[in-house]
Amino acid sequence: MTCDIKLTYIDDKLDPLLVDYLYTISENEHIFEYDEYNFDSSKDSYQSLLENTNIASSDIIIVDSKLFENEFADSKSKFTGQELKIIYAIANPFIKIIVITQNNDLSKYGVIKKFATSRECSGREQEEANKYYDNVLRKEIETLIKNVKEVRNVGQLLSENILSYEDSLIVEKANNLISKIPSYKDLTDEKINELIDLVKKDIEENND
Protein backbone atom coordinates (compact mmCIF):
# COMPACT_ATOMS: atom_id res chain seq x y z
CA MET A 1 0.00 0.00 0.00
CA THR A 2 1.28 3.46 -0.89
CA CYS A 3 0.52 6.80 0.74
CA ASP A 4 0.30 10.21 -0.89
CA ILE A 5 1.55 12.06 2.20
CA LYS A 6 5.33 12.45 2.20
CA LEU A 7 7.36 13.09 5.36
CA THR A 8 11.07 13.93 5.16
CA TYR A 9 13.51 14.01 8.07
CA ILE A 10 16.47 16.41 7.64
CA ASP A 11 19.47 16.34 9.96
CA ASP A 12 23.23 16.82 9.78
CA LYS A 13 23.50 13.62 11.80
CA LEU A 14 20.44 11.43 11.36
CA ASP A 15 19.24 10.10 14.70
CA PRO A 16 18.97 6.28 14.34
CA LEU A 17 16.22 5.99 16.96
CA LEU A 18 14.09 8.63 15.28
CA VAL A 19 14.80 7.15 11.84
CA ASP A 20 13.64 3.72 13.03
CA TYR A 21 10.54 5.21 14.65
CA LEU A 22 9.48 7.10 11.52
CA TYR A 23 10.40 4.28 9.14
CA THR A 24 8.44 1.71 11.17
CA ILE A 25 5.31 3.87 11.16
CA SER A 26 5.67 4.39 7.43
CA GLU A 27 6.09 0.68 6.71
CA ASN A 28 3.49 -0.67 9.14
CA GLU A 29 0.75 1.95 9.12
CA HIS A 30 1.17 3.62 5.72
CA ILE A 31 0.05 7.03 7.00
CA PHE A 32 2.98 8.70 5.25
CA GLU A 33 5.82 7.90 2.86
CA TYR A 34 9.14 8.30 4.67
CA ASP A 35 12.26 9.93 3.25
CA GLU A 36 15.39 11.40 4.82
CA TYR A 37 18.13 13.83 3.92
CA ASN A 38 21.59 14.04 5.46
CA PHE A 39 22.43 17.75 5.56
CA ASP A 40 26.04 18.46 4.58
CA SER A 41 27.24 21.83 5.88
CA SER A 42 30.15 21.82 3.42
CA LYS A 43 27.79 22.10 0.45
CA ASP A 44 24.21 22.61 1.65
CA SER A 45 22.41 25.86 2.44
CA TYR A 46 18.81 27.00 2.83
CA GLN A 47 18.79 27.64 -0.92
CA SER A 48 19.90 24.10 -1.76
CA LEU A 49 17.17 22.71 0.50
CA LEU A 50 14.54 24.88 -1.19
CA GLU A 51 15.72 23.74 -4.62
CA ASN A 52 16.05 20.04 -3.75
CA THR A 53 13.18 18.35 -5.61
CA ASN A 54 12.90 15.45 -3.15
CA ILE A 55 12.54 17.85 -0.22
CA ALA A 56 10.26 20.23 -2.15
CA SER A 57 7.87 17.34 -2.83
CA SER A 58 7.40 16.75 0.91
CA ASP A 59 4.20 17.55 2.77
CA ILE A 60 5.81 17.42 6.21
CA ILE A 61 9.44 18.07 7.10
CA ILE A 62 11.04 17.15 10.43
CA VAL A 63 14.25 19.15 10.75
CA ASP A 64 16.92 19.38 13.40
CA SER A 65 17.26 22.74 15.12
CA LYS A 66 21.02 22.85 14.56
CA LEU A 67 21.86 21.87 11.01
CA PHE A 68 25.61 22.24 11.32
CA GLU A 69 28.42 20.87 13.50
CA ASN A 70 31.53 22.24 11.79
CA GLU A 71 32.35 25.68 13.20
CA PHE A 72 34.41 26.40 10.08
CA ALA A 73 31.55 25.69 7.69
CA ASP A 74 30.47 28.32 5.20
CA SER A 75 28.35 30.95 6.97
CA LYS A 76 25.55 30.36 4.45
CA SER A 77 25.27 26.81 5.82
CA LYS A 78 24.90 27.96 9.41
CA PHE A 79 21.21 28.28 10.08
CA THR A 80 18.71 26.63 12.39
CA GLY A 81 15.60 24.57 11.88
CA GLN A 82 13.59 27.49 13.28
CA GLU A 83 14.95 29.72 10.53
CA LEU A 84 14.13 27.13 7.88
CA LYS A 85 10.59 26.96 9.25
CA ILE A 86 10.20 30.72 8.77
CA ILE A 87 11.67 30.56 5.26
CA TYR A 88 9.24 27.81 4.28
CA ALA A 89 6.38 29.83 5.72
CA ILE A 90 7.05 32.23 2.85
CA ALA A 91 8.34 29.83 0.17
CA ASN A 92 5.48 27.35 0.62
CA PRO A 93 3.30 27.67 3.74
CA PHE A 94 1.52 24.42 2.82
CA ILE A 95 4.65 22.39 3.59
CA LYS A 96 4.50 21.77 7.34
CA ILE A 97 7.67 21.94 9.42
CA ILE A 98 8.40 20.23 12.75
CA VAL A 99 11.63 21.35 14.44
CA ILE A 100 13.42 18.97 16.81
CA THR A 101 16.42 19.53 19.08
CA GLN A 102 18.76 18.00 21.63
CA ASN A 103 18.59 21.20 23.69
CA ASN A 104 16.25 21.74 26.61
CA ASP A 105 15.48 25.45 26.24
CA LEU A 106 13.70 25.77 22.87
CA SER A 107 10.17 24.63 23.73
CA LYS A 108 9.06 28.29 23.72
CA TYR A 109 9.65 28.22 19.95
CA GLY A 110 7.49 25.14 19.47
CA VAL A 111 10.57 22.93 19.13
CA ILE A 112 10.26 19.27 20.15
CA LYS A 113 13.08 17.73 22.17
CA LYS A 114 14.72 14.60 20.79
CA PHE A 115 14.87 11.43 22.82
CA ALA A 116 18.19 11.41 24.67
CA THR A 117 20.24 8.69 23.00
CA SER A 118 23.30 6.90 24.33
CA ARG A 119 26.37 6.04 22.26
CA GLU A 120 25.04 2.58 21.39
CA CYS A 121 21.39 2.05 20.47
CA SER A 122 19.85 -1.08 21.97
CA GLY A 123 16.50 -2.76 21.46
CA ARG A 124 15.40 -1.55 24.88
CA GLU A 125 16.41 2.00 24.07
CA GLN A 126 14.46 1.86 20.80
CA GLU A 127 11.36 0.77 22.72
CA GLU A 128 11.79 3.69 25.12
CA ALA A 129 12.33 6.08 22.21
CA ASN A 130 9.17 4.80 20.50
CA LYS A 131 7.13 5.44 23.65
CA TYR A 132 8.66 8.90 24.00
CA TYR A 133 7.94 9.88 20.39
CA ASP A 134 4.44 8.46 20.62
CA ASN A 135 3.85 10.98 23.41
CA VAL A 136 5.60 14.07 22.02
CA LEU A 137 5.68 13.66 18.23
CA ARG A 138 2.96 11.33 17.02
CA LYS A 139 0.03 13.66 17.71
CA GLU A 140 1.83 16.53 15.97
CA ILE A 141 2.41 14.40 12.87
CA GLU A 142 -1.21 13.23 12.79
CA THR A 143 -2.47 16.80 13.17
CA LEU A 144 -0.29 17.97 10.28
CA ILE A 145 -1.42 15.07 8.09
CA LYS A 146 -5.00 16.15 8.75
CA ASN A 147 -4.09 19.74 7.84
CA VAL A 148 -2.44 18.63 4.60
CA LYS A 149 -5.54 16.68 3.59
CA GLU A 150 -7.81 19.63 4.42
CA VAL A 151 -5.68 21.97 2.29
CA ARG A 152 -5.81 19.51 -0.59
CA ASN A 153 -9.59 19.35 -0.33
CA VAL A 154 -9.82 23.14 -0.47
CA GLY A 155 -7.41 23.12 -3.39
CA GLN A 156 -9.72 20.72 -5.19
CA LEU A 157 -12.62 23.14 -4.66
CA LEU A 158 -10.53 25.96 -6.10
CA SER A 159 -9.78 23.83 -9.15
CA GLU A 160 -13.44 22.94 -9.61
CA ASN A 161 -14.42 26.61 -9.39
CA ILE A 162 -11.59 27.80 -11.62
CA LEU A 163 -13.90 29.91 -13.80
CA SER A 164 -14.82 32.02 -10.79
CA TYR A 165 -11.14 32.80 -10.18
CA GLU A 166 -9.75 32.91 -13.71
CA ASP A 167 -8.38 36.44 -13.28
CA SER A 168 -6.97 35.84 -9.80
CA LEU A 169 -3.19 35.44 -9.56
CA ILE A 170 -3.54 34.71 -5.84
CA VAL A 171 -5.67 31.62 -6.47
CA GLU A 172 -3.29 30.48 -9.20
CA LYS A 173 -0.34 30.86 -6.83
CA ALA A 174 -2.19 28.99 -4.06
CA ASN A 175 -2.96 26.10 -6.39
CA ASN A 176 0.64 25.99 -7.57
CA LEU A 177 1.93 25.85 -3.99
CA ILE A 178 -0.52 23.09 -3.05
CA SER A 179 0.62 21.18 -6.14
CA LYS A 180 4.29 21.70 -5.14
CA ILE A 181 5.03 23.93 -8.14
CA PRO A 182 7.75 26.19 -6.69
CA SER A 183 8.01 29.91 -7.26
CA TYR A 184 10.76 31.73 -5.41
CA LYS A 185 10.74 34.93 -7.46
CA ASP A 186 9.53 36.97 -4.49
CA LEU A 187 11.80 35.20 -2.02
CA THR A 188 14.92 37.36 -2.34
CA ASP A 189 18.12 36.83 -0.36
CA GLU A 190 17.53 40.19 1.31
CA LYS A 191 14.10 39.15 2.60
CA ILE A 192 15.43 35.79 3.78
CA ASN A 193 18.37 37.40 5.58
CA GLU A 194 16.01 39.84 7.32
CA LEU A 195 13.91 36.93 8.59
CA ILE A 196 16.97 34.99 9.75
CA ASP A 197 18.34 38.04 11.59
CA LEU A 198 15.01 38.47 13.40
CA VAL A 199 14.96 34.82 14.51
CA LYS A 200 18.60 34.92 15.64
CA LYS A 201 18.04 38.14 17.57
CA ASP A 202 15.01 36.67 19.34
CA ILE A 203 16.91 33.49 20.26
CA GLU A 204 19.94 35.43 21.54
CA GLU A 205 17.77 37.76 23.65
CA ASN A 206 15.96 34.83 25.26
CA ASN A 207 19.24 33.02 25.99
CA ASP A 208 20.72 36.00 27.86
State the predicted function of each range.
Residues 2-4, 56-58, 94:
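A general structural motif
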Residues 3-26:
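Conserved acidic segment of CheY-like receiver
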Residues 16-21, 46, 71-77, 107-113:
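A short acidic (Asp/Glu
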Residues 22-29, 51-55, 85-93, 111-117:
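Short, surface-exposed basic-aromatic patches at helix termini and helix-loop junctions that form
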Residues 31-44:
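Short hydrophobic/Thr-rich beta-strand motif most characteristic of the beta2 strand and flanking loop
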Residues 43-91, 102:
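Conserved phosphotransfer microenvironments
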Residues 92-152:
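Alpha4 helix (beta4-alpha4-beta5 surface) of REC/receiver domains from two-component response regulators
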Residues 142-208:
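C-terminal output/effector regions of signal-responsive regulators
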